[in-house]
């Protein structure tokens, strides 16, 4: 393992960040458009160059990983290790920024918004402060090195709500990040399926209030799922667990009043919003029959005020998402650096899907690839 360790250490030193997942450096699946190695795919729509913005990518700082290694929790008999030396070697790919930019060039991505992942909610306040500080310093330095290609979303310790609000403000004011990424639930350390906080919990109101005050983007991304009926071998933790957690998180925010208490929040839900947009009519029908805890509006109306990436993997999935939430709420997302470790082409094809969807006009394509994200991130046009 010595040579591999040396390679990882060298890359980490050059990058200052871990790019998580397995999606780097692999050839695209057959039939998808990419640039030749060393070249840049410049996406064109209707004869005009479009600066594509990817709002769903992953990153983590190795220095933060070092603080967390050898620490784990037990869930349903599984040892869940966010960062531990051997796990890191097996499950994390480390690349310097030049490798990432080359991969972006090949996939037709001009700007990537890097979200910190995995999302960890078990550290005590002191360790959480250390993790956030070093993560954000490294992320800010990387983005400053490539300001026209990379932006960052911070990590906040939601298990400590007051500290989370404080860290959020630092992310926006000090590091100039447009916002942060959060999980779909804050679980109790070592306890599966027993939340410390749902995102709608009143204890998190200081965080949501600060996000609304700052106009910060809050991206919701699932955490690792452990369940006796699925595991990493069959992929159900990802393909079922992730969209399910997103549907639950959104439902809590809607039915428990968070979106009413903070109506100006800017929330992006990755993976096309999970299962809820696909079957929100069921939630609408249920809500109309409630006598207590009834949302002020139909759930489908709240969905139209949130944002979603277009990572649906099919024309019909994208068409239905747009029909439910509106074209103005959909942005490009690739899950670059994430996705199942067994699926090497997971994040390829996101741009192709938008370019080739037969129901989209050129104006629609430009909106999803650039315009909606430009507005959401408050970028200069």
Enumerate the language-model features and the residues they cover.
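Active-site gating/metal-coordination segments in enzymes
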Residues: 110-249
């Amino acid at each position: 393992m010595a040579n591999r360790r040396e390679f990882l250490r060298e890359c980490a030193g050059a990058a200052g960040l871990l790019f998580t997942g397995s999606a780097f450096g692999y050839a695209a699946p057959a039939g998808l458009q990419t640039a030749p190695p060393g070249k840049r795919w410049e996406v064109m729509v209707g004869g005009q160059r479009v600066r594509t913005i990817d709002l769903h990518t992953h990153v983590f700082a190795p220095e933060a990983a070092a603080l967390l290694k050898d620490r784990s929790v037990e869930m349903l008999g599984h040892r869940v290790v966010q960062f531990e030396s051997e796990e890191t070697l097996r499950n994390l790919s480390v690349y310097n920024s030049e490798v990432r930019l080359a991969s972006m060039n090949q996939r037709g991505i001009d700007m990537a918004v890097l979200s910190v992942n995995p999302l960890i909610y078990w550290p005590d306040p002191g360790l959480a402060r250390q993790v956030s500080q070093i993560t954000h310093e490294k992320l800010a330095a990387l983005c400053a090195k490539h300001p026209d290609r990379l932006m960052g979303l911070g990590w906040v310790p939601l298990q400590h709500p007051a500290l989370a609000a404080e860290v959020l403000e630092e992310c926006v004011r000090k590091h100039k990040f447009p916002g942060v990424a959060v999980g779909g639930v804050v679980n109790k350390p070592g306890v599966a399926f027993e939340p410390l906080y749902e995102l709608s919990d009143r204890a998190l109101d200081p965080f949501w209030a600060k996000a609304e005050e700052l106009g910060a983007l809050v991206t919701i991304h699932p955490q690792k799922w452990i369940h006796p009926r699925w595991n990493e071998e069959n992929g159900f933790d990802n393909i079922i667990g992730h969209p399910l957690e997103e549907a639950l998180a959104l439902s809590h925010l809607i039915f428990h009043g968070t979106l009413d208490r903070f109506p100006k929040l800017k929330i992006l839900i990755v993976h096309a919003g999970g299962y809820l947009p696909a079957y929100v009519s069921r939630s609408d029908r249920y809500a109309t029959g409630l006598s207590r805890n009834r949302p002020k509006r139909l759930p489908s109306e709240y969905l139209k005020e949130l944002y979603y990436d277009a990572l649906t993997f099919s024309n019909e999935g994208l068409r239905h998402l747009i029909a439910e939430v509106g074209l103005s709420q959909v942005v490009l997302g690739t899950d670059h650096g994430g996705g199942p470790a067994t699926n090497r082409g997971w994040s390829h094809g996101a741009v192709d899907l938008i370019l080739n969807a037969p129901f989209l006009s050129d104006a629609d394509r430009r909106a999803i690839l650039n315009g909606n994200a430009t507005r959401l991130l408050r970028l200069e046009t």
